Amino acid sequence: RDNKYKARIKILLKAMGVEEFTRQVEAEWADLKDGPETLTQEEFDRVAKWFQPHAYRTLETIDVAASQADNKPFANWLDRNVKPHKVPGYAAVLLSLKKTGVPPGDATDGQLDFVADLADQFSFGEVRVTHEQNLVLADVEQSRLFALWQLLKSQGLATPNIGLLTDIIACPGGDYCSLANAKSLPIAAAIAERFDDLDFQHDIGDIELNISGCINACGHHHVGNIGILGVDKDGSEWYQVSVGGAQGNTSAIGKIIGPSFSAPQMPEVIGRLLETYVQCRIEGERFVDTVGRLGIAPFKEHVYATPIPAGEPAKEDQYA
């Protein structure tokens, strides 16, 4: 690489071409293979000793959801924020850092101290961080989920929106990053505020909305079901929108729907994309599946059908 503003393998790959890039990788590997840095079984075993299984108790699996069906807030949290565990009687709990009014992934020092204490009480002293900008208590006994939920609520860490529209991935953007072409956090704030209705979000279902302030793509916009990329046009901030991106075993790069938008237009753009999805989806179909079945044409048509008012410019920092 020769440009710190474009420090990504994808940019180097495009510049060199697949064949030349592959040739150089293979040449480098031939030089390194069987060298002094080769991982031996002895070294593997040494490191593995630090990752022994926890002292799990012998427990029976509990149908917590069935026993708490009448408690809708808790049931919603169980549905979105609690995941199955390979050990009977345990669950993995995601702590949402996506409460409306808070920058995606942000936590205060007090919240982090609180989570550290919870980890000691509920999860063998272990906390994990996800690339979706949330936290995980990976080993919680199912019988203690209700108690944990109540404690998380007291610190604003129990928003039941994991995997939903407001579980936004966003880079710091122009407010905090010198490489950014545009702000990301005010866009995330405006979208979260516009769709701050958990019933609506649960109806929309699984959807990944990712925002990056520049082509370095720290917000993974290119693999978001809806991706937003900040771009610079003659010193002004604009936002390019793509749909159909996906991560995981069915990974895909999103396709750009058309010309970019100003910051004040973005919540309405997202609204029109969701309207198209609701009108076109079949039962049980996720947003990304609808895009995969129909392509971007119906989404593009609806978004650009009528002009979107420019509105007021985004504030310097919606979270200040």
Tell me the role of every PLM-derived stretch.
Residues 1-320:
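Peripheral terminal and linker regions in Fe-S/redox and tRNA-modifying enzymes
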